């Protein structure tokens, strides 16, 4: 995930997951000659609690001699201006921040997504009628983003923190059913775990299989376009007999590459 001597910036919320991740990397940084830093985005959605979490992260990094980058955004105001949800706005702000830091410091950004997060995301995407890619789960690596804890359960992470005596904060909004993901976490997943106590691992295996299928279809779509290409266009006689799934993928690839309004 990170090359020897590389730079990694931990997305630090102050919760158990990111505290565990930072602690792991601090323990490993000398062995692998890593430059470890951290970043924190204050969404200002929880009043004083948001500020308290930010100060917690500052103190944690000070104690571990870790450089911390902090950005503050009024997500409520911005989401209203853009007419999008708090969740979408917050995510956009986070990844904009990550992209800036990754480019500036030639760094990998380590997020603390775990196997429970992956399960929640997969279920959420199912309810939205997601494609194969959407059902492939949260990738362990995507561009500059790495997720070292994606195969580790939230329970194991909390046990780790307890074992090392690590303090962390709890986001009060995670305790309510205000957000869709929380409804899934509190109401759907407990039932699934009654049916299959290892459901996180089962879904991870499913994600892996679907990811391989999605990759095969994507490569097949790319090959079809290569075969059918003629100058700046494509020969319909080369496309019409193609497998419908591969043809749909080829069209999706074109839509991603070309402004559909100009076709």
Question: Where do the protein language model's features map onto the residues?
Answer:
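Contiguous mid-protein beta-loop-alpha structural module that forms a pocket-lining wall or clamp
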Residues: 146-236, 251
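Active-site catalytic microenvironments for nucleophilic, acid-base chemistry
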Residues: 24-31, 191-194, 254-257
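AMP-forming adenylation/ATP pyrophosphatase catalytic core
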Residues: 1-17, 37, 41, 73, ...
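Short coil/turn residues that cap or connect secondary-structure elements
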Residues: 49, 130, 195, 243-246, ...
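Core alpha/beta nucleotide-donor-binding catalytic domains of modification enzymes
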Residues: 1-187
